Structure formats: C-alpha cells, structure tokens
From Swiss-Prot:
Involved in DNA repair and RecF pathway recombination. It comes from the Bacteria. GO terms for biological process: DNA recombination; double-strand break repair. PANTHER family: DNA REPAIR PROTEIN RECO. The lineage of its organism: Bacteria, Pseudomonadati, Pseudomonadota, Alphaproteobacteria, Rickettsiales. Belongs to the RecO family. SUPFAM superfamilies: ArfGap/RecO-like zinc finger. Keywords: DNA damage, DNA recombination, DNA repair. This is DNA repair protein RecO.
Length: 240
C-alpha cells in the first residue's frame, strides 16, 4: 500500500530516539499519520504548518505506515515572533489533529488552510477574518454548518444580533431581546465572515467575540461528542 501527496504538518511526536510520528493534513488523503526518521535538520523540517511532499507506505491501509518527506515550504519563521499568530496556527493544528477523521479528504478545508497560512505569512491585516472563516468551514465540513443567514423564528435577514446556542441559527434583535441572556451574541465581524466579506479589519475584542461563538460550537459539536478536551491554546486566544 503506497500513496504520494502534499500535506501540512499538524502534529509531531517523538517515538524513541531516532523516529517521529507525524500527523499530516493532506490534500487528497485527509488526516494521515506515519513514522519518519529524525535527521540533523528535523527541528526545521518538521515544524507545525510546514508543507511537505509525503510518500506513505505500509503493508495494510490500517497500519501506521512509514513516511518519506521532502520539505516544500517552511512558513513558520514568517510569524513565529508574533505570539497571537503563532498560537493561532498551532491551536488550529491541534484542533484538526483531535477532530478530523482519519483518511477522509477535506479538500476545501485543506485549500483554505493553505490560503490562510499565506495570508498570515504576508501579514495581511484581515487574517483574523480568514481564521474565523476556517473555524466555520471546519464545522461545515464535519456536518455542523451554522445557519446565520436569517432569523430562525421570523425569517427576516436584518438586525440579526444573536445566535441560538441550541440550534446554531441566527436570531433577530426584536425576537432575541426577550431572552438575550440565553443567547450568544452575533458579532458584526462574524456576520461579515459568514457572508464572505473577509477584507475588513476589526478590533481584537471583536475578533475574540467571534472566537467565543465559533469555539462554543466547536466544543459542543466536536470535542464534547468525541469526549476530548478543548485545546488550552485555543482558550488562550481569548485571554491575550
């Protein structure tokens, strides 16, 4: 059993003195793991977010298998001095490692992650919007798309200021004001991202409001269902 693909490193764990278990998010094979040998330049080659050419081989598809890797690009040095960006990319990698099913392609999510890495690498000011879009897309790809297009009660598309924590659907101000303490806020930034307006810049506080909402649904639909702890790094993004 053998395949070749490109992939982004989302986790790396030492296995003995001379080996590493790599977890890759690949373009055509989804999340895959494999054993690879440590080399003199391993610290540089096997950083989170690095893009690799990978050749995987094993006797059976369900085996861990072996990975031969060739570095295509190492973007981490572009943003490692920016604490928020570094935490963001490592946090999202951890999320993918924990919730993505094995061997199921998610090509759209993969392409968007590659694009997001380019966005932060080139210091695009709208990178936070692109990140929220990634988390929304992850929910969608795994079958939990939020419906933020109209009010769940009345169907109106204006003045959407809340989100139901039970259904993941938008609620208008007129309806939601009566039980606002039981609803999540619907930040303007998240509204724009949902409607594919990713170019605006917002305050960090607005970004954190968006993170609280997407984080709530990531935890509810994915982590709690898998009985897996929500990543501490993701929580750290709310306290910076």
């Amino acid at each position: 059993m053998r395949w070749k693909d490109e992939g982004i490193i989302i986790a790396a764990k030492k296995y003995g003195d001379k080996n590493l278990i790599l977890s890759l998010f690949t373009k055509n094979h989804g999340k895959r793991r494999g054993l690879t040998k440590l080399t003199n330049n391993s610290n540089y080659k096997f950083q989170i977010s690095n893009l690799l050419h990978a050749e995987w081989s094993a006797k059976l598809p369900e085996n861990l298998g072996f990975l031969k890797c060739e570095l295509i690009e190492s973007p981490f040095h572009h943003f490692f001095q920016d604490r928020l960006k570094s935490i963001t990319i490592v946090s999202f990698s951890s999320i993918l490692e924990k919730v993505l099913p094995e061997s199921e392609p998610c090509a759209m999510l993969y392409d968007n992650l590659r694009y997001f890495i380019d966005v932060i690498k080139h210091n695009n000011q709208s990178w936070q919007s692109h990140y929220l879009n990634l988390e929304l897309l992850l929910l969608t790809q795994l079958g939990f798309k939020l419906d933020l297009s109209k009010c769940a009660v009345t169907g109106v598309k204006e003045n959407l200021q809340f989100i139901s924590p039970k259904t993941g659907r938008a609620v208008s101000k007129k309806v939601g004001d009566y039980y606002a303490d039981k609803l999540l806020p619907f930040p303007q930034m998240l509204h724009d991202v949902y409607n594919n307006n990713l170019q605006n810049s917002y305050s960090f506080q607005e970004f954190q409001l968006g993170l609280k909402v997407t984080g709530y649904f990531l935890n509810k639909y994915l982590f709690l269902q898998l009985n897996v702890k929500f990543p501490e790094l993701r929580n750290l993004m709310l306290s910076l």
